[in-house]
Amino acid sequence: MSVEGIVDTNVAIVANGHAEHVGVDCQLACVQQLILIQRGQRVCIDHSGLILSEYRRYLSHSGQPGLGDAFFKWLWDNQANIYVCDQVTITPTNDGEQLFAEFPDDPALARFDPSDRKFVAVARAHPAHPPIHNAVDTDWYQYQEALAAHGVVIIQVCPDDLRRLADRQ
């Protein structure tokens, strides 16, 4: 496993079938993406456990009943396995607003979802600048160019559903 990647929580949620606003094709794409990641990539998370804590709020530790839950259990069980998981140190700059030194200081990103900033911080702190996988979170779509200007690559797993959702806003 040599390729690294970061997985936004919404990919696993959609894989579980808990996103009624998307089609079955998107759910299948998320399932396939998680399987590909498990078979051939190292997953990047933060050393302090913020990403795993977010997963824990939305996914089951038991690994059931969905494939997103199975991904979470696999990652949880392998978080210390350097061949599967790469833990990256990120630097919080305050306690309550989820701000990180690694997040770009850019007015174009001022309204970017604070709860997703940890993923960006991990991508920028990691030496390989791994891509972030997104299913249907429109922030990743709306801010894709601004993030790219700072070296953050977003892989849109469900581009058609995402465009449709973004057009509704």
Show the residue positions of the predicted features.
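Short, well-structured N-terminal submotif of metal-dependent ribonuclease cores
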Residues: 1-47
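Acidic, PIN/NYN-like endoribonuclease modules and their adjacent C-terminal/linker elements
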Residues: 2, 47-48, 120, 124-169
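Short His-Asn-centered micro-motif
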Residues: 7-9, 45-49, 112-115, 133-138
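A short acidic (Asp/Glu
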Residues: 15-18, 54-59, 143-146
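Well-ordered, non-membrane alpha-helical segments in soluble/globular domains
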Residues: 21-32, 65-74, 140
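Short amphipathic alpha-helical segments and helix-helix/interface helices
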Residues: 31-35, 72, 120, 124
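PIN-domain endoribonuclease scaffold, especially VapC-family toxins
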Residues: 36-41, 49-99
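Active-site neighborhoods of divalent-metal-dependent phosphate/nucleic-acid chemistry enzymes
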Residues: 84-132
